[in-house]
Curated annotation (Swiss-Prot):
Homodimer. The lineage of its organism: Bacteria, Bacillati, Bacillota, Bacilli, Lactobacillales. This is D-aminoacyl-tRNA deacylase. The keyword RNA-binding applies. Disulfide bonds: none annotated. Its EC number is 3.1.1.96. Belongs to the DTD family. One of its GO terms (cellular component) is cytoplasm. The gene is dtd. A Gly-cisPro motif from one monomer fits into the active site of the other monomer to allow specific chiral rejection of L-amino acids. It comes from Lactobacillus johnsonii (strain CNCM I-12250 / La1 / NCC 533). An aminoacyl-tRNA editing enzyme that deacylates mischarged D-aminoacyl-tRNAs. Also deacylates mischarged glycyl-tRNA(Ala), protecting cells against glycine mischarging by AlaRS. Acts via tRNA-based rather than protein-based catalysis; rejects L-amino acids rather than detecting D-amino acids in the active site. By recycling D-aminoacyl-tRNA to D-amino acids and free tRNA molecules, this enzyme counteracts the toxicity associated with the formation of D-aminoacyl-tRNA entities in vivo and helps enforce protein L-homochirality. SUPFAM superfamilies: DTD-like.
Length: 145
């Protein structure tokens, strides 16, 4: 499982120019599931995201978690995160998990985050989406589980 965590001031996702998910301060999560991922990886990723301290405290140190700043989450499924570009010029996506299991695990991931007390907005699994955001920092982390 690979999750790109982007610290944002705001973010939204639209489908056919209609906004389907929108947050203020928080995390934009781009989520890629790979073959072999199970609920164990989903829970581990959700736990890490809930606890990671990448917001600045009053002294300017990255010492605060998403919960500490009352942040929100926008979760977007993105299988292209698992692209293999080592050979040739055309990315291979053989490592990316296929639906319906990938959809179920992405939904499980979002539920895990909600169960931890976060407000979670989402894109639509498998849809062609337009994601817009205002990075805060920028501060971007790639989480591989």
């Amino acid at each position: 499982m690979r999750v790109v965590i982007q610290r944002v001031n705001k973010a939204q996702v639209a489908i056919d120019n209609e906004v389907v998910g929108k947050i203020k301060r928080g995390f934009l999560l781009l989520v890629g599931l790979r073959n072999g991922d199970e609920l164990e990886q989903v829970k581990k990723a959700a736990d890490k995201i809930a606890k990671i301290r990448i917001f600045e405290d009053k002294d300017g140190k990255t010492n605060l978690s998403l919960k500490d700043v009352n942040g929100e989450i926008l979760s977007v499924s993105q299988f292209t995160l698992l692209a293999n570009t080592k050979k040739g010029n055309r990315p291979s996506f053989v490592e990316a998990m296929r639906p319906p299991k990938s959809k179920q695990l992405w939904e499980d991931f979002n539920h895990e985050l909600e169960d931890k007390g976060f407000h979670v907005e989402t894109g639509e699994f498998g849809a062609d989406m337009q994601v817009s955001l205002e990075n805060d920092g920028p501060f971007t982390i790639v989480l591989d589980i």
